[in-house]
Swiss-Prot record:
This is Regulator of microtubule dynamics protein 3. The modification Phosphothreonine is found at residue 159. Pfam families: RMD1-3. Residues 39-70, 169-206 are annotated as: Disordered. Interacts with PTPN2. Interacts with microtubules. Interacts with VAPB. Interacts (via FFAT motif) with MOSPD2 (via MSP domain). Interacts (via phosphorylated FFAT motif) with MOSPD2, VAPA and VAPB. A motif (FFAT) lies at residues 156-162. The transmembrane region is required for mitochondrial localization. The FFAT motif is required for interaction with MOSPD2. The FFAT motif is involved in the interaction with VAPA and VAPB and its phosphorylation regulates these interactions. It comes from Bos taurus. It comes from the Eukaryota. Involved in cellular calcium homeostasis regulation. May participate in differentiation and apoptosis of keratinocytes. Overexpression induces apoptosis. Gene3D superfamilies: Tetratricopeptide repeat domain. The lineage of its organism: Eukaryota, Metazoa, Chordata, Craniata, Vertebrata.
Length: 471
């Protein structure tokens, strides 16, 4: 009986154990199925689209996967690889985006450059219009005006490029010539007493303008100007000694030219209506422009002299001296103008020099000026000639042979007229390949002393020609 009880208890324990194991197995199978179902659902929701965007479990939100840069997540960071086609599309999109950014930057730079260019053009046009308005007001109302300063300085109307060994220098006629010392070298050699004389000369100009203004105001109010102290109106016999003295002072030293300018300026109120007086006054302004070193003062003298020459031409168009000095002053004033005004002054210079030669063909200075103009034009670059042609209806045309003919004509009319002229002849012959003639004219140039600033400036070029041509 006891054995049967023991056997029954053992069977009951075994059944309980089997039931427990079966329950645990069922729970494990159920949990495994749920876990697999959750994994499959998460994979289906995280599939990537063709544009490499990942859809998250939250609807309406898309996040673009970031590529790990070297050093950000470590070199061992591994991202899920994309199909080959999607990688190519992504690279192309990145290239297009980079190109668009670069293109936008270039467009912005181009826009800023165009704005700057437009502003410069507008400024030049406005300056040109203001200058025209000033000229119109000056002709209508005889009032003096202040001169504007100018810091720019270039060649009168063209810059002749005659080689690497030659530089530009300023001539007696007021326009730039080739083969000379630079402005900086001349500034370093200027003496202090010359500065004082320039200041006195400027004060003289201001006083002369004031006296002229007073006279014009009296005429406008209907008042008669005061008669000269000697009594009576000035006649031919009264003015001729004055004009002869002015001519002598013009041919003299720098101090003599200053005294001649002062003499003419003091007598402008009395003889300012005479053409022969006015062109001499314009010539004196040209002399002062040559003697002055400050750019603003040079422009002021050149502008005043050109105005006097214009008034002289209004009194008669058949005076060769009026045309000659008007041309010279155009060249001097062009040194302080822009490229367009310089080119226009160049054509005006040529026109009035031709008229001066036609009216007085035996004048050596007019032929010398024409030769220098032809020499400079013959050395213009192709781009400079095209620019001048675009700004004017008449094309530029001059050769070294044309310049040589004019220089030889001046030498024929007056042998030894200019040392610079003989140096120009030497250069022309050298450029034409005629070295024996060039050497002969070099020797003739060495015989003449330095008279003008241009002669002194050409001394260095003459020494270089001696080395090139030989003794």
């Amino acid at each position: 009986m006891s054995s049967l009880g023991t056997l029954g208890g053992a069977r009951a324990g075994l059944g309980l154990l089997l039931g427990t194991a079966a329950g645990l197995g069922f729970l494990c199978a159920l949990y495994s199925q749920r876990w697999k179902r959750t994994q499959r659902r998460g994979q289906s929701q995280s599939q990537s689209n063709s544009l490499d965007y990942t859809q998250t479990s939250e609807p309406g939100r898309q996040v673009r996967p970031l590529r790990a840069a070297p050093g950000e997540a470590g070199d061992a960071a591994v991202l899920s690889s994309l199909p080959r086609g999607q990688e190519v599309v992504l690279d192309r999109l990145e290239f297009v985006l980079t190109s668009l950014v670069a293109l936008r930057r270039e467009v912005e730079e181009l826009r800023s450059s165009l704005q700057g260019l437009a502003g410069q053009i507008v400024g030049e046009v406005r300056s040109h219009m203001e200058e025209n308005q000033k000229v119109a007001r000056r002709r209508r109302f005889p009032f003096a005006r202040e001169r504007s300063d100018s810091t720019g300085s270039s060649s009168v109307y063209f810059t002749a490029a005659s080689g690497a060994t030659f530089t530009d220098a300023e001539s007696e006629g007021g326009y730039t010539t080739a083969n000379a010392e630079s402005d900086y070298e001349r500034d370093s050699e200027r003496e202090s007493d010359g500065d004082g004389e320039d200041e006195v000369s400027c004060e003289t100009v201001k006083m002369g303008r004031k006296d002229s203004l007073d006279l014009e105001v009296e005429v406008a109010l209907g008042l008669e100007p005061e008669a000269p102290e000697a009594g009576g109106s000035p006649g031919q016999e009264d003015v001729m000694p004055l004009l002869q003295q002015a001519d002598e002072l013009h041919q003299g030293s720098e101090q003599g030219k200053r005294e001649g300018f002062q003499l003419l300026l003091n007598n402008k109120l009395v003889h300012g209506s005479r053409q022969d007086f006015l062109w001499r006054l314009a010539r004196a302004y040209s002399d002062m422009c040559e003697l002055t070193e400050e750019a603003s003062e040079k422009r002021s003298y050149a502008l005043s002299g050109k105005e006097e020459a214009e008034v002289a031409l209004e009194k008669g168009n058949e005076n060769a001296e009026c045309h000659q000095w008007y041309a010279v002053l155009c060249g001097q004033l062009a040194e302080h103008e822009g490229i367009q005004r310089r080119i226009q002054s160049g054509f005006s210079f040529k026109e009035h020099v031709d008229k001066a030669i036609a009216l007085k063909p035996e004048n050596p200075m007019a032929h010398f000026l024409l030769g220098r103009w032809c020499y400079q034009v013959s050395h213009l670059s192709w781009l400079e000639k095209k620019t001048a042609t675009a700004l004017s209806e008449s094309p530029l045309g001059a050769t070294v042979q044309d310049a040589l003919s004019s220089f030889l004509k001046a030498e024929e009319l007056q042998p030894g007229f200019s040392k610079a002229g003989r140096i120009y002849i030497c250069k022309c012959y050298k450029e034409l390949g005629k070295n024996p003639e060039a050497k002969e004219w070099m020797k003739l140039a060495l015989e003449l002393p330095n008279v003008t600033k241009e002669d002194s400036a050409f001394q260095k070029d003459l020494e270089e020609l001696e080395v090139i041509l030989g003794e």
